[in-house]
Amino acid sequence: MDRMVNMNIHFLRDIADIQTGPFGSQLHKEDYVDFGTPIVTVEHLGNRVFTEQNLPKVSDEDKIRLSKYVLKEGDIVFSRVGSVDRCSYVDAAHDGWMFSGRCLRVRPNAEVDPLYLYYFFCLEDTKQFVRNIAVGVTMPSINTKLLGEVE
């Protein structure tokens, strides 16, 4: 119980880097190739893990050009539009993949256990909070600023 009393509460923006995926002008459908680095889209955010069917891919050149959108083990990827409370954890098998413009990437800093943070986002109370801060009636959406408000 003493640990709970001494527990600090932080905003997500203070304990993680939050990045929006590449905008349409940076990555076009014409850039997709048959063999290359997979790109996670909203459609690939499965039940806590990525679904791997019909993944778009980009060339090594585009991966280098868009290197700030490369995922690392421990990242958490969110839907930026629609089901904004849906997220998937980047495990070792998906390290080096990329994420699309309709996603947000959360990269916890070194002091934060990424799996702990991921499980926090899987809690129904946290999911409800994310749904509540979303903007838009027809198509809910979140951005880096809104997601950064999660505490």
Residue ranges with predicted function:
Residues 65-66, 93, 137:
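A structural connector/turn signal
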Residues 96-104, 112-115, 135-151:
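A short glycine-rich beta-alpha junction/loop motif
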